[in-house]
Structures are given as C-alpha cells and as structure tokens.
Amino acid sequence: MPEHDLAALWEAHCRCEFETRDADATMATMVASPYVNHIPTMAGGVGHDQLKRFYKYHFIGANPPDMTMIPVSRTIGTDRLVDEMIVRFTHTTTIDWMLPGIPPTGRTVEVPLVAIVQFRDGKVAHEHIYWDQASVLVQIGKLDAQGLPVAGAAAAHKVLDPARPSNTLLGEAWAGSDGKPI
C-alpha cells in the first residue's frame, strides 16, 4: 500500500493546473526538481525553473475554456498512478503542449489520453503524457486520414463504448478473415 494517498495528491495537482490555474500552486505539489513530458510534442520541462516557465506561459490558462477530461480508468501502484481519460475541447486557442504553432481551427477534438505520474516523498516527481497525435491532427483538419490507419474521434468513442465495432480500419483484411476457422 502506498505511503501517501496518490490519488488525492494527483487530484490536488490537477486542481492547481485546471481549476485555480496557478503555476506557483502547481509547482508546490511537485518535488524540487520535477519534470513533465507530453510525449507526442516533447512539451514540458525539466527542473523547477524550466517547468514553471512551461506551466506559466504555455499550459496553465492556455487551454480552451471548454476543455473537459472524462475519467476512464485509474491504476495506482506504490509510487505511480496511471490515469486513462478522454480529453474533449474546441480548438479555440493555441495549445502549445498539444498543437504547438497551430492557430485555432474552431474544430472539436476528442482524444484518449494517458498520464503516467510518479511520486516521491508525497509530491509529483514526473509526468509522462501520451495521446494519439495523428487522431488530433485529423480532427483539426491538418492531416488527411484518407488511406491512413487513423481513427480520429472514433478512438475516443470506442474507449467510452467498448460495444462499438472493432477492426474498422482493417477494411478488406478484416472482411477476408470472415468465416475462416478460429
């Protein structure tokens, strides 16, 4: 059993990021030399000063006002927490951490996102954040999915509703295996 309530620590950290939108309060939930890496874009920071700069000028308060996170699952270990969620927003602002350099398109985005968070001494030590960047780029109109195995918003819908069809991107390959012995 973890020494600290990792879920409570993580939720306090997220409140500072998304509700109070306070970079100093966010940093106070972290170890002295933390790091955050949004893997698809390599956005974040290493060490207190670089990460505080990232939070203050490129993350906190820069997210679209309608951004919501729908929890899907949470796994808690002795020093780590893994959150699976769906992130929904309308692309009305420049989102440096997810879509660096891309001006607002006004389009809606729904994407599964996974946060892997490590804790040390009752504080957040680091975060690794993953999502399918191709699906995001398709949804904002920057990538044509024609002929590519990219699910777009359908991936988020499938996470929320496992009864939705699987293998839709397999096309003829999936149809060709129909009726074969299993």
Where are these regions (language model features)?
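C-terminal and inter-domain tail/linker signature
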Residues: 1-182
